[in-house]
Amino acid sequence: ILDALDRAIAAGTAGNIAESGRLVSEADASLRGESGLGTLIDNIALVSGLVSRVDQLDVLASGAEAQLESESGLSTREVERRSNELIALRDATWSLRNDRLRTAKAVGELAGKDASASARNAYLSIQQAFSALDRMEVRGRDSAGVHVLVWGHGLDATDKRVAPLLAGRLDDTLFTNGSVRVGAGSRAWSFVYKAAAEIGELGDNTRAMRTTVSN
């Protein structure tokens, strides 16, 4: 992945923005989903290398954009082609920084240290839901909630190590934030997380829910 980004930087430096964007897009695609999360999580060296290269690519794209704006005598078709190449490069680098790296960091914070791969994958689904809620909030929502269904966990609600963690959460008739329901035979459990920051900043609701989930 880092090699692909190094080649993307070299291509962009040589003026081949299209090739640079293609290579960054391929690197971004390789880090999507559960397999990408497994590659990034707790891999400090890789994450540091990615951040450094994405920073370089952003500078490269800004320089190419400034050069395009300063050039005169270009045909409309040429301007359009080069603009589209820059957009593709910027989109790919933005996705690496704000989708892949940000998601891996958020999942790590939700799941905690030493979480299993299956647990991290489950938290990835929760993080994806939170990201969707963040986008919805921009459109004016002032409350949000997530209902999480977990099965195949092998836990027993009556276990003396588990029961204290469920105290006060099983009998909430209003199903408020933090409530839990245990299905027949303890096979499936449902957890609810809710927040309503009617007066506040964008992201307040998901920040509150992330704190509840991680605790």
Regions found by a protein language model. Give the residues of each.
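N-terminal segments that mediate ammonia production and transfer
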Residues: 1-215
